[in-house]
């Protein structure tokens, strides 16, 4: 699969938000500091967050229960690590469970998708008054690493894939009031979508001429810096970053996908995104946070799809969980397997979860399940995770409430704790705060769970203990 730039996209390349240029500067009025002393573990070079938008049904997926409503073709069997597992949905992931830690003692704060997704991406409660200034976790990570850019880096620190341009379930959260250099490089793997940073054959000369014109303007700017608008200087910085990326001989290797590998990853937008994530990690070219979106998990109706698909037929055609899980299964298992084979998994931290769980008990009148914040599950892999193959936490027979926590605090694991863990594995002090925000309020990397800070957030240390 060769994703080349179209002629129209080429004309818009200056609008692509990229970072990593030596000319990129952070706003002078925004300062980061910490009043606490923590020791980030720094066990990963990159994080991949697989964001299951809509909220998967925990009792059918990562916390399988054999209920009256459970279809027989979910094929509940013991996986190699002893966990009851839905082989009918995740046969390939069963083969990599010994490389993961399955956490079942997680909960959410909210039951609305956009607020739940805000927690997923920012690690904060949504505030309408501050929404425009609040940066995402990916942009904070980009800010931290912009000052550590190496001369060999040609990719931005933050890459986000498969986010729709608008979504009632929560849009992609970007840089807020941070410098535009911390905004993500967005990649859409839908069929027929071109990527505005790959040069098509025959366009190199045109690209070079535009760069020469920009450099001529830069010469004039040096003669009279005051005459150049600030927005143009930012655009100039982005364009130089884009030039570094587009002219790199490695960029084509990352975004040109081998057909056999695509088949193994499922040959879907989800599979292609995970395959590109693998290539980005292998390139070691500056990317630190990869956010991959898979929508469609909001199964208020027909969670088990069409009932007229017989066992033995292609269950993916049934829709509902069957289709989504098949896409995730091939993509997730392919990513974990390939990173492990390339000795990259130990330095890559992978998180796979949704914003909340779904209602236990009987299906609703539409044959679906509604929102349930009391229980959700996640898969973690790599990045220093120890004793993979184990399970942390447990729920009751209906997956309705947590019955065993398996971690140091006497409460469920919340989104803020996941955020703190991601910062920690990247070597970032999660207790930092940024002053000088437009609202006058500090932005804390991870917000305490109460206005007084009495209930603090922390990394999930048990992931890294044998």
Q: Which residues fall in each region the model found?
A:
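Ligand-binding pockets and gating/stacking loops
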Residues: 1-466
């Amino acid at each position: 699969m060769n994703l080349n730039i179209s002629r129209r996209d080429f004309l818009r390349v200056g609008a692509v938000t990229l970072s990593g240029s030596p000319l990129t500067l952070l706003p002078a009025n925004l300062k980061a500091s910490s009043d606490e002393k923590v020791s980030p573990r720094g066990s990963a070079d990159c994080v991949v967050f697989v964001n299951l938008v809509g909220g998967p049904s925990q009792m059918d997926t990562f916390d399988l229960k054999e209920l009256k409503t459970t279809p027989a073709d979910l094929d509940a069997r013991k996986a190699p690590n002893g966990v009851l597992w839905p082989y009918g949905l995740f046969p390939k992931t069963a083969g990599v469970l010994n490389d993961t830690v399955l956490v079942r003692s997680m909960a959410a704060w909210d039951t609305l998708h956009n607020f739940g997704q805000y927690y997923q991406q920012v690690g904060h409660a949504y505030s309408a008054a501050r929404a425009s200034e609040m940066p995402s976790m990916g942009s904070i990570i980009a800010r931290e690493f912009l000052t550590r850019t190496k001369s060999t880096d040609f990719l931005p620190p933050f890459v986000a894939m498969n986010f729709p341009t608008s979504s009632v379930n929560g849009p992609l959260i970007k840089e807020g009031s941070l410098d535009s250099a911390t905004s993500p490089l967005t990649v859409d793997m839908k069929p027929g979508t071109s990527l505005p940073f790959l040069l098509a054959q025959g366009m190199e000369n045109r690209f070079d001429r535009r760069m020469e014109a920009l450099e001529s303007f830069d010469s004039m700017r040096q003669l009279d810096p005051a005459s150049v608008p600030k927005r143009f200087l930012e655009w100039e910085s982005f364009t130089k970053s884009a030039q570094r990326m587009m002219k790199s001989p490695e960029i084509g290797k990352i975004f040109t996908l081998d057909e056999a590998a695509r088949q193994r990853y499922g040959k879907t937008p989800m599979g292609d995104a995970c395959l590109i994530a693998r290539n980005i990690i292998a390139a070691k070219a500056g990317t630190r946070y990869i956010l991959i979106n898979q929508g469609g998990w909001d199964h208020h109706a027909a969670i088990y799809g069409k009932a007229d698909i017989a066992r033995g037929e292609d269950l993916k055609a049934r829709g509902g969980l069957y289709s989504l899980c098949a896409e995730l299964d091939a993509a997730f298992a392919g990513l974990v397997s390939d990173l492990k084979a390339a000795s990259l998994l130990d330095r890559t931290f992978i998180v796979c979860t949704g914003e909340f769980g779904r209602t236990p008990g009987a299906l609703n009148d539409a044959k679906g399940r509604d929102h349930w914040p009391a229980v959700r599950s996640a898969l973690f892999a790599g990045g220093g995770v120890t004793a993979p193959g184990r399970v942390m936490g447990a729920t009751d027979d209906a997956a309705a409430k947590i019955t065993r926590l398996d971690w140091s605090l006497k409460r469920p694991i919340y989104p803020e704790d996941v955020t703190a863990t991601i910062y920690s594995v990247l070597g970032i002090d999660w207790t930092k705060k940024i002053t000088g925000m437009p609202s006058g309020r500090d932005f804390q990397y991870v917000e305490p769970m109460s206005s007084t800070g009495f209930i603090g957030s922390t990394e999930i240390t048990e992931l890294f203990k044998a």
